[in-house]
Structures are given as structure tokens and as C-alpha cells.
Swiss-Prot record:
GO terms for molecular function: misfolded RNA binding; mRNA binding; RNA folding chaperone. PANTHER family: NUCLEOLAR PROTEIN OF 40 KDA (PTHR15838), PROTEIN PIGMENT DEFECTIVE 338, CHLOROPLASTIC (PTHR15838:SF3). GO terms for biological process: nonphotochemical quenching; plastid organization; plastid translation; positive regulation of translation; response to light stimulus; RNA stabilization. The keyword RNA-binding does not apply. It comes from the Eukaryota. This is Protein PIGMENT DEFECTIVE 338, chloroplastic.
Amino acid sequence: MQTLLCQPCKSLPILTASSSSSLIRSSGDVRECIDFRASEKVSKFQFHVTLSPFAFRGFSICREFAVRGAYGIRFCSREDVSGVGNGGIVAEEEIELLNKPNPLPKSENEESGKADDDAILEPFLKFFKPEEEGEGIESEVSDETDRVSVEYYDPKPGDFVVGVVVSGNENKLDVNIGADMLGTMLTKEILPLYDKELDYLLCDLKYDAEEFLVNGKMGIVKDDDEGVEIAEFARQGRPVVEIGTVVFAEVLGRTLSGRPLLSSRRYFRRIAWHRVRQIKQLNEPIEVKITEWNTGGLLTRIEGLRAFIPKQELVKKVNTFTELKENVGRRFLVQITRLNEDKNDLILSEKVAWEKLYLREGTLLEGTVVKILPYGAQVKLGDSSRSGLLHISNITRRRIGSVSDVLQVDESVKVLVVKSLFPDKISLSIADLESEPGLFISDREKVFTEAEEMAKKYREKMPLVATSPISDRPPITSSFPQGKDEEIYANWEWFKFESQ
């Protein structure tokens, strides 16, 4: 016989009967006998359990048993739980092990607390519902949008927009373009100019106004009263433009936060390419200043765009890199020969510009005789590498036997450009500068003195060449939009000017 000592727990009710009771159950070869005594004031029980030699390892209390007295008692088994009392099953708390936690029953207060938690999480649970359940939410959002009467501009990449600077710092500007969010423009995207170009474009009216202010030249007037440069603004943490400034820009896209990304540099670059196409269509030479050089030629800028002059297109032949470098800072008359915006290719030529300016019929030039030929003389024109033919019939209007009788090598002469029978050849004349036939043979100095006046008379006798007006020329092919402001700028309807 083994004795098992059990401690009372809240799951085991105390019997009020003073008499002893006996519980007996037979199951196969197992016979269990439990005797217990209890009283109303007893706080501790002692159970005596008798197990047969064939008992299981863990003892199990019977499902149903009779209890003497008016109170019911309930024991827990590893299989199930049941109790008998007053002729029926009485629901009591389960018996629990010694010093082990017992799960507390759920109360009504806890149920209400959980309901409150669900109510708090309700706004967030809608994002985890299936699409069918989310249709109602989308309809609610659309209804709220319909009730809002404000219409925002929807920026798209490539749009030209007008905006107002509302805030900023040394790194970026916040620009209002009428969209649902403020646009962002980085400082480097604000100014359409490069640092190296500022020295060329900056004009000090006190010193170099006469040299700087020429027809058709773009520049920036230096204001000493302000005394603060762009770099100084950045060091002070201030935006490079004032709040309220109206800016023109191109939409590049959106940032990760959804704000429109703007660029004034890209916008003005498109305008610059458009103006370069106009210059090329006019087919007129322009003046540029050389800013850099490399082994292939010289570099300059037109309307802020980088342009290249190959050394083969220079009027004066360059033999060494030193001679090429000496051209930096000088001004050249050039003409645009090739451009490609997609490849950022802009090629210039000094030769073509020089020929257009100085090789027109009726132009007076100075030259040097470099070679004597049986039918004339080859004359080098100025400091250029170009030369023309002075035919024997154009030396003087009096008959001569040999060219060497009137001209010598390295002799300086003044010649007049005349019409050539061959388009690619340069034809020169001294006979048209004579005020009387044979004056070059008798008094060549007088011929050179009267050269300007005689050249002017020659040009007056030239037939007028009909030039097509600009309106009749074919339109310029450009990606830059043409038309009114409301057609160019996508947000023009939102942006309105009001006079005060």
C-alpha cells in the first residue's frame, strides 16, 4: 500500500459533511480506493490511496462516483471531466496540479476590452482586407475627392512650366507650379550658365562697356551695389534667388517622395538649341571668344552651349600646340557648319565665316605675292592660309609681255575680289582699281591710295542680288514648342498674373 499526500486547491471544493466517505471504482485489474475525511473548518486533507500491483504509472480518478452528502465533488481525469451532485452533473472548476499555473477563465470585462482594441485597430485593418472588401473604401475616397473642388496640375516629364519660388536654401528651391505638391529645383539646375562662362558674359559698365556692348551680344551686367556673388549666397545658407521670383523650368520627373523635379537649366538649354538653329538658318558669321583648347582645335560657347572649332577650320594655319594655345581669350568670327542636339554636337568654322565676309565680290584685300606663274600670280590673302589667282589679264588694263615684269615674289599688293568662273576658286584683280588704264605700271602707289574709292564704285556697279525674305524661308525644325504662352506652358491656366 502506498500513501499519497495531496494539498487542497481551489478546484477541489471542501465538503461540509462531517462523516467520512469512500470512493471505489473497479476497472479491470485496477482497484482504487480513496478514503477522505473532511470537516467545515478543515483546510488540509489527507487522502489514502490503495493501488493494486497492476496500477498504471499515473493514477486516474474515476469519471463518475457517488458521494454521500448533499454536496457534489468533481475530479479531473486525463481523459475528461464529469461530476455528480444532487442527481445531476455540476459544473465546477477543474482540479489543478500543485504549484502550477492555472488558466484564468475569461470574463465579460476582458471580452469588452478586446472589442475596444478592435475598434482602435479598425482604421488600420482596412489595408489588410481582400480587394472585395476594399472596394467600399476606394469608393469612399473617390467620394471625398469629388467633394473637393480644387483642381491641381498634373506634371509630366518634358512639360514646360511656370512657377513661383516660395522657399529654399543653398541646396534647392521649393517652387509652386500648381501641382498637389511643391516642386523641387536643385541649385545647380537654377542658373543656365557655367562658372567659366561668367567671366566672358560679365560686363562691368565702368570699364569695358564700349567693348562689351555690341549688337546681338548677350551678357550680364555687374552690380557692385549688391556686393554679394552667387557663391556668397550659398555660403550664407540663402537661396540664390529671392522668394517670389517667377521661374521657367522643365519637368524632369518626380522624386521618391512624389514631388515634381524641375530644371531651369534644361529649359534654357532647349531654348539655346532653338536659337542656334536660327543662327544657322540666317547663314551669317557670329563673334565668339575662345575659352579652351585641345589637341584637335579650339573650344568656345554659343548661347551657353559648348562648340568646337577644328584646327583645320582655322584661317591661320597652326603648326604647334603653343600657337594653338595662344588663341585662348581671342575673339573669332565663325559660322555654324554642323549641329546635332541629340549628340550635343556643335561644329564651327572660321574659314567659312572668313570667306563669307572677305571673299565676296567687291571686297578689297591686302595680299602678298607668293608665286609667279606664266598666266598670272598666286597671292596669299592677309594672314590667312587662303590664296587667290591674279590672272595676267587682271593685273592692268594695258598689255604686258610677262608677269615677272610688273610683279615680284613677296611683294605686297592690294587686290579686289571679283567674280570667278570657277566657284571653288578665288579670283583677284588690280586692273579694276585703276582710275585710268595702265596706272599700275606708271604709278602703283596712286593705285593703292585710291583703292578704297575705286572698290566702292565697283560695288555700286554690281547688280543687286535678290535675297529671299526671312518669312519665305523654311521653318526651323526644332523640338522647342512654338506658339502662345498658354500653348507652350502646360500649367499656364493655373498661373495667372494680376496687376496691382
